């Protein structure tokens, strides 16, 4: 795979012209360098995935998370996608350089697509007050995208409201030279994979659930895509892409207390995507883009031990944006106006949730909980205006300057709604209601103004380039004035691109979590017959931020090998967590959010790849080796994020020792050392491409919370929370993808691809419990992919 490497950016193949035009707006760079490598890796904190890269990589469910899985700056939650739940198609959470997954910024064509409603809560459990969400506002199908850029360090000043990284997805723009129509079909099913299940989990796995944890013993995935590219008039055209990704999962309909299964039912998991962009090249000076976007996801669930608990949970996002580029005599002006609607919802089939000592479901009788909690939703409408002015380069003596300035205003209209009244209670032995709570119908909203100003300058002298910048953010949600310094320097040591050093310091302020305010609104609709109340306090919070020190090295070895090393050190400050207390006098439970969370992360990566592929007969061979290491310590669960309630603990017992809590290694996303060998073989005459990734992951540790019944529990430390780590073995996996584009079908351009993930069928434990029950990664998995271009 051909890529053009530029300090600060990676470009690829036919996309170079447009990508270079976009990237010129962000960062100074030296002369281009062309390399060949199977998998994009960071160059000075930027990784650029073109449509060619996306087609090469086995992208699983087709989400952005799947695309970024192999990036050395990224770590996945290894417990989220396992042998137990391969039928799920939702995007997985990602952590970038040790930051919480909910603190990443997602953009579509430069406009925020981040869901900041309740991104740390991905629970599928029934709840009357808490709505599931995730940080990706749009569940994009990457096969419909033109390119995706990950900014993991040295992030330019125009990007903000994140602690981890920025993921900017670009929708395809009209190109008269592209194919008119592309059709695609992709599939897998439970019969095509090997599941590794602990003996203690087999019964629950075969039933399809355990309480509110959902498994996929029997599923079929079918993905359909359609995209087209059409010229409508001179210098005016449109692109559009449609996709449906569907997983049909068969689970137990109801399981009694003694394990009797009463029927099975099929539950759908669906993600729809629709993207379109109209482009008008009005003149040499003016270009207009009108973008329309939509994704909708829905998931059907029931709690198998609760009759009549069926519910639908999902997300719907849609929006439009108008972008105008104006080339002035002395500068380039870009103006963007956009609107995005992002919503999450839970819709139960029933409005009453109750427990009774004696109930009947089919032929089964006994104590049970049944019903549902009505329909509840929350949403935000973001109205965006942003502009940026890039001055043309000018010189002062021997020093050249290229400053740019920008401003952004976003009005966020956030609201939450309970669409009908619901109730929950327990029927006691006397047949009377106890623990009775009424959730009243209601709707409430928050209006938030977000302001941003930024400026930076590209300063070059001989073979040294500097980029100082500063960003200012303010919003009236937390009412904090945040100033983010950004600085990067590049040094081309011999002025010939063979040896380059990049270094910098940057600060990144995070985004707001709207659910803290919306939850307080929902709590006001809750009436407890006993008089209990709930309050949420968040108004005095500081904005969480990360300080970053980073360095990158790039060295050409001989005539054909490129080596790159990157080091990133992050300190996370003022991370949000919570504490709860009860005022017995007023019967009020008060949840107070605080800034007690903190982490420190060391991240290092090293890669070797070729400037030119190896040619053996008619086969091009592209090898690549990537090492990455990420280690974090802190007092915050990355998964729980702002819902973490342990950060107030100054000391804990860890592996038998009383230690400071913030010195304990972070437990989740804990995959420190990874080494991968990527190898592509391309035979142009036959149209065959064979892509391979052999990945080794060092032994890692699973965190276990000890109870008094555990043998490792130390009674003299009973006043402290106690944790112990259990070692999980190292793993070796081999993923392969074979694609064939028959050269004798030039008009149709048919491509048939087969993915085999975990070819070796390695049995890798990813988690364990305090009773020794292990959870394993997925075994060998087959995917089939067919596409045709006209």
Swiss-Prot record:
User: Transport among the record's keywords?
Assistant: yes
Alphabetical list of InterPro entries matching this protein: Plug_dom, Plug_dom_sf, TonB-dep_rcpt-like, TonB_rcpt_b-brl_sf
Q: How does it sit in the membrane?
A: Multi-pass membrane protein
Q: TBDR beta-barrel domain: from which residue to which, for each copy? A: 178-790
Task: Return the Pfam families for the record.
Answer: Plug
The UniProt entry's GO CC annotations, sorted and at most eight, read: cell outer membrane
Give all residue intervals belonging to the TBDR plug domain.
Answer: 37-172
Give the main localization category: membrane
Q: Which UniProt keywords apply?
A: Cell outer membrane, Membrane, Transmembrane, Transmembrane beta strand, Transport
Q: Give the superkingdom in one word.
A: Bacteria
Q: What is this protein called?
A: Uncharacterized protein YddB
Species for this entry: Escherichia coli (strain K12)
Q: What is the lineage of its organism?
A: Bacteria, Pseudomonadati, Pseudomonadota, Gammaproteobacteria, Enterobacterales
- Whichever gene encodes this chain, its name is yddB
């Amino acid at each position: 795979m051909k890529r053009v490497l530029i300090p600060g950016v990676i470009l690829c193949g036919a996309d170079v012209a447009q990508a270079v035009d976009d990237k010129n707006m962000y960062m100074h760079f030296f002369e281009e360098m062309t390399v060949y490598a199977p998998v994009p890796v960071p160059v000075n904190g930027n990784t650029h995935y073109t449509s060619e890269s996306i087609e090469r990589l086995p992208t699983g469910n087709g989400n952005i998370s799947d695309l970024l899985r192999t990036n050395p700056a990224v770590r996945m939650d290894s417990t989220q996608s396992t042998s137990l739940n391969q039928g799920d198609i939702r995007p997985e959470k990602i952590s970038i350089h040790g930051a919480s997954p909910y603190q990443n910024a997602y953009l579509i064509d430069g406009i925020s697509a981040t869901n900041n409603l309740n991104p740390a809560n991905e629970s599928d459990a029934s709840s009357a007050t808490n709505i599931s969400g995730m940080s990706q506002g749009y569940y994009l199908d990457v096969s419909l995208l033109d390119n995706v850029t990950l900014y993991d360090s040295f992030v330019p000043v125009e990007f903000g409201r994140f602690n981890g990284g920025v993921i900017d997805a670009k929708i395809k723009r009209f190109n008269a030279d592209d194919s008119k129509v592309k059709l695609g079909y992709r599939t897998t099913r439970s019969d095509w994979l090997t599941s590794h299940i602990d003996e203690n989990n087999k019964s629950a796995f075969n039933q399809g659930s355990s309480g509110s944890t959902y498994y996929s013993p029997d599923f079929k995935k079918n993905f359909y895509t359609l995209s087209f590219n059409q010229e409508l008039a001179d210098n005016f055209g449109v692109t559009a892409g449609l996709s449906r990704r569907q997983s049909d999962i068969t689970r137990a309909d109801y399981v009694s207390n003694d394990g009797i299964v009463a029927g099975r039912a099929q539950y759908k998991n669906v993600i729809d995507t629709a993207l379109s962009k109209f482009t008008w090249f009005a003149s040499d000076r003016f270009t207009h883009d009108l973008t329309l976007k939509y994704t909708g996801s829905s998931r059907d669930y029931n709690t198998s031990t609760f009759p009549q608990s069926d519910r639908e949970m999902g997300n719907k996002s849609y929006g439009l944006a108008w972008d105008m580029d104006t080339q002035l005599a002395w500068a380039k002006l870009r103006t963007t106006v956009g609107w995005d609607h992002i919503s999450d919802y839970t819709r139960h089939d029933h409005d009453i949730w109750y427990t009774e000592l004696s109930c009947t479901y089919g032929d089964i009788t006994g104590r049970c909980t049944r019903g549902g909690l009505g329909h509840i939703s929350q949403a935000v409408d973001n109205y965006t205006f942003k502009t940026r002015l890039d001055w043309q380069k000018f010189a002062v003596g021997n020093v050249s300057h290229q400053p740019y300035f920008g401003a952004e205003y976003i009005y966020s209209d956030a609201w939450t709604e309970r669409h009908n009244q619901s109730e929950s209670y327990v029927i006691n032995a006397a047949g009377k209601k106890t623990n009775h709570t009424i959730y009243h119908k209601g709707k409430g909203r928050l209006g938030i103004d977000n302001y941003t100003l930024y400026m930076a300058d590209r300063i070059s002298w001989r073979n040294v380039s500097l980029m100082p910048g500063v960003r200012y953010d303010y919003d009236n949600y937390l009412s904090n004035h945040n100033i983010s310094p950004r600085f990067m320097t590049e040094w081309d040591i011999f002025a010939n691109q063979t040896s380059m050093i990049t270094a910098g310091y940057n600060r990144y302020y995070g985004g707001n979590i709207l659910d803290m305010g919306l939850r307080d609104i929902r709590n006001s609709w809750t009436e407890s017959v006993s008089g209990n109340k709930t309050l949420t306090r968040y108004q005095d919070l500081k904005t969480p931020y990360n300080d970053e020190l980073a360095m990158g090295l790039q060295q050409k070895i001989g005539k054909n090998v490129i080596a790159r090393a990157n080091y990133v050190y992050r300190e996370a400050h003022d991370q949000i967590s919570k504490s709860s207390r009860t005022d017995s006098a007023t019967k009020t439970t008060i949840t107070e959010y605080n800034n007690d969370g903190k982490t420190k992360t060391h991240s290092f990566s090293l890669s070797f790849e070729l400037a030119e592929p190896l040619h053996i007969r008619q086969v091009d061979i592209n090898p690549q080796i990537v090492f990455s290491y990420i280690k974090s310590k802190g007092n915050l669960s990355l998964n729980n994020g702002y819902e973490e309630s342990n950060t107030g603990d100054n000391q804990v017992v860890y592996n038998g020792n009383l230690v400071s809590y913030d010195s304990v290694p972070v437990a989740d996303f804990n995959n420190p050392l990874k080494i991968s060998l990527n190898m592509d073989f391309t035979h142009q005459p036959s149209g065959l491409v064979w892509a391979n990734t052999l990945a080794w992951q060092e032994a890692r540790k699973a965190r276990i919370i000890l109870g008094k019944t555990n043998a490792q529990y130390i009674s003299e430390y009973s006043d402290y929370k106690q944790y112990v780590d259990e070692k999980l073995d190292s793993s070796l996996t081999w993923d392969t993808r074979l694609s064939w584009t028959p050269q004798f079908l030039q008009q149709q351009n048919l491509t048939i691809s087969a993915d085999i993930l975990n070819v070796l069928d390695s049995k890798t434990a990813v988690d364990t419990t305090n009773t020794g029950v292990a959870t394993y990664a997925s075994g060998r998995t087959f995917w089939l992919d067919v596409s045709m271009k006209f």
